[in-house]
Amino acid sequence: MAAFAHSAPCWADVQLSDLEAGKRFYGGLFGWTFRAGDGMHFADAFSGGRLVAALAAKKDGRMPTTWGVYFATDDIRATVAAIREHGGQIITEPVRAGRAGIVAQAADPGGAVFGLWQPEEREGFEKQNEPGSFCWTEVYTRQPDRVDPFYEKVFGFRGTDLDETGHDVSDDAEALVDFRMWSPEGVEPGPDTAIGGRSVITDAFPAELPSYFLVYFAVADCDAAAELTMRLGGRVAQPPFDIPYGRMAVLHDDQGAVFAVLQPTELLP
């Protein structure tokens, strides 16, 4: 398994009230298979025999039912210090996750929660950017003026606004959205090198919606995935629509966790 570059999204997991129901839902939607973790409080998810995510049983019913993303770091304590220096908060101090690695939880200045992962025996995803696996993440925030410099200073991201990419988005849903893509340090920023992004929570969203990271999974057929989600007991928050990079939908699983599916352009008919 290849090592992830510092600042790259390297892992995703979902916190659920009912772990077995989560297995049924995501197994039905993505074809995932599962292996129980130590203590049986979480399950690793596999696509085609390769590790793609984890499902975890919530330790406290008051915790949100949500997907979370983790960024790779070469030095988790240095990254924690940078987060504090640039206006973020540490929710969970670095702690060992068995022999797999060291993990921490943080929040950006707008309140969006994300994880840090310093690998040891487990690097992260064994499969991504293929159907049934992670392909993208973006943070939704009401404070882009604070959040953009935070991520660019903490992780060294270089940003590209959507209107700088050369795509004609005049007929796309994203044309109405202030959207910024992030590329890792050391590469030319742009769509070809982007590993994540930032969108803005506008007045079109519910006033009570907090800042959050939206996790995307690649699928071979976006419309079919949305239909299957409903058959499995989930719901469609945003029906399938076209963007410059494919066709996507925003969905909720049968316990309320939100995520997105993306049918990349090369898989469109």
Question: Over which residues does each language-model region extend?
Answer:
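Short, structured interface segments
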Residues: 106-126
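Conserved beta-strand in the GNAT
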Residues: 53-56, 105, 114-115, 195-199, ...
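Core segments of cupin and vicinal oxygen chelate
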Residues: 2-51, 85, 95-101, 141-193, ...
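Vicinal oxygen chelate
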Residues: 18-20, 46-51, 69-110, 144, ...
